[in-house]
Amino acid sequence: MKLQKPKGTQDILPVAAAKWQYVEDVARETFKQYHYGEIRTPMFEHYEVISRSVGDTTDIVTKEMYDFYDKGDRHITLRPEGTAPVVRSYVENKLFAPEVQKPVKLYYIGSMFRYERPQVGRSREFHQIGVECFGSANPATDVETIAMAYHLFERLGIKGVTLHLNSLGNAASRAAYRQALIDYLSPMRETLSKDSQRRLDENPLRVLDSKEKEDKIAVANAPSILDYLDEDSQAHFDAVRSMLEALAIPYVIDTNMVRGLDYYNHTIFEFITEVNQSELTICAGGRYDGLVEYFGGPATPGFGFGLGLERLLLILDKQGVELPVEEGLDVYIAVLGADANVAALALTQAIRRQGFTVERDYLGRKIKAQFKSADTFKAKVVITLGESEIKAGQAVLKHNQTRQEMTVSFDQIQTDFASIFAECVQ
């Protein structure tokens, strides 16, 4: 049997991983500027953590979750999204306590799992960057969080991103709209897809989110939820729009956008860009003021977003964005002979401890092959160690581009390599 990775997963090899690390580092730096701290939650949770929060009728729960019973007969699921585990952790660790400064700002980077058909930018194991902010109902929190995502895209060099915005209002607004949508869709029930016929009974707002052609036709003239916002909901949405305009962040109102999760209220948003003439959602999120209470905590407003790393990297690649990933070595040590093998080990460690990236030959190859490796690794400096260098206590350093050489003592290399390196590459 030929052993291969499971369908819908990938091996991220070093060249690609360097790009992943760069994007993750930029995200971390950006979030730190907004005073977010990192949180790491388990890759698996109790089934109810996801099903109760995401929604029993969502596609994630009904079709896509990797769930199983463990040896203790506990119903477990691999996490399909990041918000519910973070909210569970917020409540379990009592981050709502008065001594904890509010708002509590958290970010995460990690693997998520959904059983769905693998396609470009969508895998069964995917990696998500997300943020959650707890304790502020201020519309400025909505806008700051959206602006943070926008700031991240700017720093990465992504172009052509459009902010799509909508409001689901509060519970009263949503209930009124739910009934209006049922009244509108019920007469055309038989024209809907099978999934949307089920959604009409369980959660009619899900019909607006359908990608099926017949459902898109059916909802084309559906009533707008914005017509059902009560005074408080309208004031919140107006404030969000006003603040976005104050920050010069362009947006479009998308009344058919409802998000694929049941816990949202008030502001929801997506950042969308175009790749190969197809629209791709690059980031999505919104407000969830009831979720902490649903998990047994006190009433606590929340706002957050998630974005897929694979999709983000795909868009960067399609837009031709060159990430400034560091390549190459500072130093390559060519080794000739058994005595030099030991000396190379000591020199390599000494140079590394001074902050330089170093590689050496381990295979006892001819010098020409070793120099070729130095070129392949894009080494800036090559140090040659042979029997004569060992006897003299000196090494020959060569600039790998200009081929200029200099001879220095082992003592100098071990104590002040920075000065030697600077002189060699100048």
Curated annotation (Swiss-Prot):
Organism name: Streptococcus equi subsp. zooepidemicus (strain H70)
Biological process per Gene Ontology, one example term: histidyl-tRNA aminoacylation
Family: Belongs to the class-II aminoacyl-tRNA synthetase family.
A GO term for molecular function: histidine-tRNA ligase activity
Superkingdom of this protein's organism: Bacteria
Reactions performed catalytically: tRNA(His) + L-histidine + ATP = L-histidyl-tRNA(His) + AMP + diphosphate + H(+)
InterPro entries, alphabetized: aa-tRNA-synth_II, aa-tRNA-synth_II/BPL/LPL, Anticodon-bd, Anticodon-bd_dom_sf, His-tRNA-ligase, HisRS-like_core, HisRS/HisZ, HisRS_anticodon
Major site of localization recorded for this protein: cytoplasm
Cell compartments where the protein resides: Cytoplasm
Quaternary structure, from the entry: Homodimer.
Keywords linked to the UniProt accession: Aminoacyl-tRNA synthetase, ATP-binding, Cytoplasm, Ligase, Nucleotide-binding, Protein biosynthesis
GO cellular component: cytoplasm
Official protein name in the record: Histidine--tRNA ligase
EC number(s) from the headed UniProt entry: 6.1.1.21
CDD domains referenced in this protein's UniProt entry, alphabetically: HisRS-like_core, HisRS_anticodon
Matching NCBIfam families: hisS
